[in-house]
From Swiss-Prot:
NCBIfam families: ATP_synt_delta, PRK05758.2-2. The lineage of its organism: Bacteria, Pseudomonadati, Pseudomonadota, Gammaproteobacteria, Moraxellales. This is ATP synthase subunit delta. Belongs to the ATPase delta chain family. The keyword Thylakoid does not apply. GO terms for cellular component: plasma membrane; proton-transporting ATP synthase complex. F(1)F(0) ATP synthase produces ATP from ADP in the presence of a proton or sodium gradient. F-type ATPases consist of two structural domains, F(1) containing the extramembraneous catalytic core and F(0) containing the membrane proton channel, linked together by a central stalk and a peripheral stalk. During catalysis, ATP synthesis in the catalytic domain of F(1) is coupled via a rotary mechanism of the central stalk subunits to proton translocation. It comes from the Bacteria. Pfam families: OSCP (PF00213). Its main location: membrane.
């Protein structure tokens, strides 16, 4: 059976294409972010997995949760999550209503096909579609030591020039790399760490 990421791709593309055509890219990103957060919550996911609950009820519950706890910003925890995601709430009530109906139909389809568990992966793929449309890429950089401002700026400039896109760097530190960095952009990984070089040398010597 295909993995969740593979199964989620066509749903994410369909969602992004629809959102892009209807000028609701940010609104859909917000909806998918909240839905993914809910699916990742164990207590709520148990209810979503219950076959006795109808697809209509599940989709309505997810949209209602967004309506009451995010769009109205009544729930501070969800508001903080949305703000951290830099989501943009819809300003037009008419536009918001249209998006709500479309999202409800989308989630209902996933529920009927027993694929609500795909929502976190759908959200991640959706974000990638949006980034590509904006020519913006996420670069996940792991270094042996924290990068200095100069190192970060230089790396970002080089990646942007190489990829011909705006690059957002996400940093983490892993002392086991010994020195250097590893860079992951999409499915591509560049290992320029001392640990990686030592592993390559070991492989060559034992070949």
């Amino acid at each position: 059976m295909a993995d969740l990421s593979t199964l989620a791709r066509p749903y994410a593309k369909a969602a992004f294409d629809y959102a892009n055509e209807n000028g609701a890219v940010n609104e859909w990103e917000d909806f998918l972010f909240v839905a993914a957060t809910v699916v990742n919550d164990k207590s709520f996911s148990t209810w979503l997995d219950n076959p006795a609950v109808s697809a209509e009820h599940k989709s309505a519950a997810l949209v209602d949760l967004y309506d009451t706890q995010v769009a109205s910003a009544n729930d501070s925890a969800f508001k903080q999550l949305l703000d951290a995601n830099k989501g943009v709430r819809p300003d037009s009530n008419a536009s918001y209503s249209k998006v709500s109906v479309a999202f409800s139909n989308f989630v209902k389809q996933l529920s009927e096909q027993e694929r609500l568990a795909l929502l976190p992966e759908v959200y991640e793929h959706y974000r990638r579609h949006k980034a590509v449309s904006l020519k913006q890429l996420d670069a996940y950089v792991t270094s042996a030591y924290p990068l200095t401002d100069d190192q970060r700026d230089m790396l970002q400039a080089r990646l942007a020039a190489s990829l011909n896109a705006s690059v957002v760097i996400h940093e983490s530190v892993d002392a086991s790399l010994l020195a250097g960095v590893t860079i992951k952009v999409g499915d591509k990984v560049i290992d320029d760490s001392m640990r990686g070089k030592l592993q390559q040398l070991k492989t060559q010597l034992t070949a």
